[in-house]
Amino acid sequence: MASYKVTLKTPDGDNVITVPDDEYILDVAEEEGLDLPYSCRAGACSTCAGKLVSGPAPDEDQSFLDDDQIQAGYILTCVAYPTGDCVIETHKEEALY
């Protein structure tokens, strides 16, 4: 099992967490005490949306996001597994629309 360094750029500053490749980014962020937005925890809404700044795109169920949003780098942290070290801007739900 691999683990990756995920930098979360929140309104309160940058936080670096280590996320195993078989755990959701949101779940590990919560375990580390970070307060990130979420609602459904199933990839069926956009409350937890983030935007990939750098690094490989996480492996996720992107069924809620449309092709343009995916191309723009948006992800849903509640259903995203890291595939490498990456930087993600959090709190991006409003930017989706």
Swiss-Prot record:
Domain 2Fe-2S ferredoxin-type: 4-94
Gene Ontology MF annotations: 2 iron, 2 sulfur cluster binding; electron transfer activity; metal ion binding
UniProt keyword annotations, A-Z: 2Fe-2S, Electron transport, Iron, Iron-sulfur, Metal-binding, Transport
Pfam family, one: Fer2
InterPro entries linked: 2Fe-2S_ferredoxin-like_sf, 2Fe-2S_ferredoxin-type, 2Fe2S_fd_BS, Beta-grasp_dom_sf, Fd_pln
Family label: Belongs to the 2Fe2S plant-type ferredoxin family.
NCBIfam families assigned: fdx_plant (TIGR02008)
Function comment: Ferredoxins are iron-sulfur proteins that transfer electrons in a wide variety of metabolic reactions.
Protein name (Swiss-Prot/TrEMBL): Ferredoxin-1
Native species: Aphanothece sacrum
